[in-house]
Structure formats: C-alpha cells, structure tokens
C-alpha cells in the first residue's frame, strides 16, 4: 500500500548548505503543506479528511539512537541494518520526524561522510510514522573524492566521466533531497493506500491507463 512502479519526486538541491539546512527547508514545506490542506478542509466541511496539527518543529533522531531503542524494545537489529517499518512500529514513533546520521556504507556514492566519523554519513530520512517520505544528504563536491567513492562501490568511473567532468570547473558545497509526492499526500491527508493519491496508479498489477 506504499509502493508504485511510477512515482513523482520533488527534488531539492541548494548550494552552500548542508543536510541540516535541507531538513529546515523540508520543515518549512511540511508546515505550509499542512496549512494548505487544513484550509481546504475548513472550506470544504464535507471533506473526508481530518485536520492535522501543525508541529512547532519536526523532531530529529539519530540512527544510533533509534537502533538502541529498537534493541531495548526487543527488535532483532544491528548497527548497519536498515530500519524496517516493523521495527519502527515497536518503538512507537508517529507523526513527522527525521532520522539522521545514517551509516555511510549503504548510502549512494555522492553522499558525504561526517567530519567526525567517516563511518557515518551526513544524511537523513524524513518519516511519517513508519512511512519514509524523503531522503537527503550533504553531497560530495570534490571530483577526486567522488571518483574514489565510485571506485569503492565497484562502479566504473569511465562510465560516469561526463558527470565527473562537471566537477573540474568547480562545484560549491551543496546538499539536497528527494520527496515522494504521493507519499507526502498520504501523510497530509491520512490516506492509507498510495494508489488513492494519484490519478492513474501504476504498480506491478497495472500499467495502463
């Protein structure tokens, strides 16, 4: 009820910021979006949607903190594992929140590592309960570092020369994210099935229309 074969991603990229700044941008987007939906509900009393309280701020939990909570709750998880929805349910988090500072290993090649710990990434996921809405990070801006990360992940840098060449001209420090539009609509409206958030849902059982 949360996956589509074809989905819309809202991509944000900004120069001279890091992942903390991007989380702040997302927080602003969430507040504006909640207010817009609440205004619609107010002006359409027959709507089936329920107003959502606007949070003063969106909590930020580190990956390490949540792994510790899960283990104390009896979940079978270790450092480095993904945080599966079934385990997130065991610690009872609800509403909007961020999970920050994920292990670097499984992250994409362009994600920057932490200055204080090279095993940790400057990254985050935006969650709504156990539903992932967004992933973002500080990006690598240096060509040599990016090429090395590609090699470390077994990627052929020759195949990405067109991308690496852009970094020869200088790329500023930057960060960004992608937000799943249909999942965001689920969170804002209380919709339980992602198929109900898009006009022509496409999944493993339906390609047309």
For each of these PLM feature ranges, what is it?
Residues 1-16, 123-125:
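Residues forming anionic-ligand binding surfaces in small-molecule and nucleic-acid pockets
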Residues 1-2, 20-24, 109-112, 137-139, ...:
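Short conserved micro-motifs at the rims of enzyme active sites and ligand-binding pockets
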Residues 11-22, 130-132:
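A generic structural motif
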Residues 13, 99-100, 127, 134, ...:
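Residues in well-ordered beta-strands of folded domains
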Residues 18, 67, 105, 132, ...:
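Short loop/turn segments at secondary-structure transitions that flank enzyme active sites
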Residues 26-129, 152-170:
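Metal-assisted phosphate- and nucleotidyl-transfer catalytic regions
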Residues 137-138, 143-209:
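Active-site pocket scaffolds in enzymes
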